[in-house]
């Protein structure tokens, strides 16, 4: 029967095989199960094997080994955590980071693993060596960190917000001025005057945008929101800036969702100057003007496909046409990306409008219901109808001298309403001659006979 060491060796080799292009969690869980059988001895054995695998020149072997380290540290108890956070193992990881032979992808994965384990071990002071290595990485190799630390949410005063906005606008203005100057120096003397005029226009443009500030930013990293008011996004997403909420947090909109995001995760997008917009428009018009030539070239190639391309290659007109059409291919690709992005933006804007309209209509419905008039009910003093149709009821009334008298009244007479503007008067002003609303003891006079 094979020993535990032999089983662990086979399991580790399978989980860290260089032929694997992704982590095989079935193999990784198998290693964890073997370590749990004997944590004291198996922890040391498996870490020695992982150290040897990390010494390989194969990047895939090293990446699979790092994934195995994280799984073992999170699932195999305190003994293995001590092995992972020992000075010996953290020293091996530091040597890999300093080595020039290790691929950059592996170094970034090491920094990611150290960050994850440091967060997992921070509640145990005996495992602080991993936290020390994480601090060293942030200080010495900040470029290896895929995601920066989120800044704290500190309120910003009105004066600070004004000063920061002015400083930002000055930086943008200086950047535009330097860009315009570099274009003027590269252009010849024939277009120097036109460049100067464009430069003056470029100086006026930032002054008009000062009140609006930065309108859009591009995400530098992925961000998965941990709180309800935060905005999730992916690297490369363009976020529309709405307002500044905290010192280092802004509120923005992306794909119809609104939330706050940290500034160190994004970079501002400067709006194109009038000269750049005009140049892009000219390029687009030039690409679209070649549409007919592309159709002609395609037709020639289809006709020549049955005869052979050897004769077509000797045709000067075909060669000239091909050389004219080929250079527009990268511009076509760029335009496809541009309009695809604009399409996504318009779809997102449409969704925002639909949500806003739905919310607005819901608020109107609530307001209408809160101010609706209740249904008019019969006066509480109206007598109930107890007589059958045609039955003559005897009603007794008290007169002014204290005597009682009876009147025989049919149902038609009992509920007859006088025609003299009865319905146009409020109940308090209606005539007291309406017999159906008389009660004994209310009026001193008996009702009249109709």
Curated annotation (Swiss-Prot):
Composition skew (Basic and acidic residues), residue ranges: 147-167
Location of the region described as Disordered in the Swiss-Prot/TrEMBL record: 141-167, 179-212, 374-450
Biased composition (Polar residues): 184-196
PANTHER family named among the record's database cross-references: JAK PATHWAY SIGNAL TRANSDUCTION ADAPTOR MOLECULE (PTHR45929:SF3)
Record InterPro entries: ENTH_VHS, SH3-like_dom_sf, SH3_domain, STAM, UIM_dom, VHS_dom
Quaternary structure (record): Component of the ESCRT-0 complex composed of HSE1 and VPS27.
Annotated GO biological process: ATP export; microautophagy; positive regulation of protein maturation; protein secretion; protein targeting to vacuole; protein transport to vacuole involved in ubiquitin-dependent protein catabolic process via the multivesicular body sorting pathway
Gene name of the encoded protein: HSE1
Chain's role: Component of the ESCRT-0 complex which is the sorting receptor for ubiquitinated cargo proteins at the multivesicular body (MVB).
Keywords: Endosome, Membrane, Protein transport, SH3 domain, Transport
Compositionally biased intervals (Low complexity): 197-209, 394-432
UniProt record similarity statement: Belongs to the STAM family.
Protein name: Class E vacuolar protein-sorting machinery protein HSE1
One Pfam family recorded for the sequence: VHS
Subcellular localization, as worded in the UniProt entry: Endosome membrane
SMART domains assigned: SH3 (SM00326), UIM (SM00726), VHS (SM00288)
Residue ranges of domain SH3 in the record: 212-271
Ranges of residues in domain UIM: 163-182
Source organism phylogeny: Eukaryota, Fungi, Dikarya, Ascomycota, Saccharomycotina
GO molecular function: phosphatidylinositol binding; protein domain specific binding; protein heterodimerization activity; ubiquitin binding
Single GO cellular component term: ESCRT-0 complex
Domain VHS: 15-145
Topological type in the membrane: Peripheral membrane protein
